[in-house]
């Protein structure tokens, strides 16, 4: 159930170039039960910047009432958020959206989790949930260069983990699909989050597989009211049918929406 709460900053640190790990605490965490959901953060007091920032939920610890989110500090809003210190309060709205269907993976099956850039974080909580129910996980994490690689070791604790960098400075040179081809990776179910180009490449390969993708879109309200994040359905060539990424997604079955 969505709630709005002022949450306390437990810790914040830069874990890669311009990539920050922020841990917040509050009872709102008890509502975070679906990996792949996101929160809307009010990054500063006052009206500037006006819009909240959507940030995915990376890790949930309900015993401590803490959750972790990772984000890239690149615009005015996220750069402001990066200045928040331990003990300060952050206005959080969430959890929002529909996450990854963990129930679609069965114990003993192999799940392939593919993340690109800042699309990697929500896969961490998902991976933990899958491992807990006896699913074998394989991770492929794609980044531009080694300076922005993060959470490789954390994912490796859960299952086989491969990294691809576009410039070849870490792991396999190229894209996540190059890793799949090089190692001949097979799987029963696919979960993915990242840039559209990556999602399109995966859709082109695995449209007949059981697969789910999370779309990264710039969202305004986060609750389906402003229509800033609509995407059209593939089954309707007229373009009149659509779904809203923030409320109907951000996770969709592969092949359902136009990428």
UniProtKB/Swiss-Prot annotation:
FAD binds at residues 53-56, 70-72, 77-78. The keyword Metal-binding applies. Gene3D superfamilies: Dihydroorotate dehydrogenase, electron transfer subunit, Nucleotide-binding domain of ferredoxin-NADP reductase (FNR) module, Translation factors. Pfam families: DHODB_Fe-S_bind, NAD_binding_1. It comes from the Bacteria. Keywords: 2Fe-2S, Electron transport, FAD, Flavoprotein, Iron, Iron-sulfur, Metal-binding, Pyrimidine biosynthesis, Transport. Pathway: Pyrimidine metabolism; UMP biosynthesis via de novo pathway; orotate from (S)-dihydroorotate (NAD(+) route): step 1/1. GO terms for biological process: 'de novo' UMP biosynthetic process. Its cofactor is [2Fe-2S] cluster; FAD. Residues 2-102 form the FAD-binding FR-type domain. Coiled coil: none annotated. Binds 1 [2Fe-2S] cluster per subunit. Binds 1 FAD per subunit. InterPro entries: Cyt_c3_hydrogenase_gsu, Dihydroorotate_DH_ele_sf, Dihydroorotate_DH_Fe-S-bd, Dihydroorotate_DHASE_ETsu, FAD-bd_FR_type, FNR_nucleotide-bd, OxRdtase_FAD/NAD-bd, PyrK_electron_transfer. GO terms for molecular function: 2 iron, 2 sulfur cluster binding; electron transfer activity; flavin adenine dinucleotide binding; metal ion binding; oxidoreductase activity. [2Fe-2S] cluster binds at residues 221, 226, 229, 246. Responsible for channeling the electrons from the oxidation of dihydroorotate from the FMN redox center in the PyrD type B subunit to the ultimate electron acceptor NAD(+). Heterotetramer of 2 PyrK and 2 PyrD type B subunits. Belongs to the PyrK family. This is Dihydroorotate dehydrogenase B (NAD(+)), electron transfer subunit. It comes from Bacillus anthracis. The gene is pyrK.
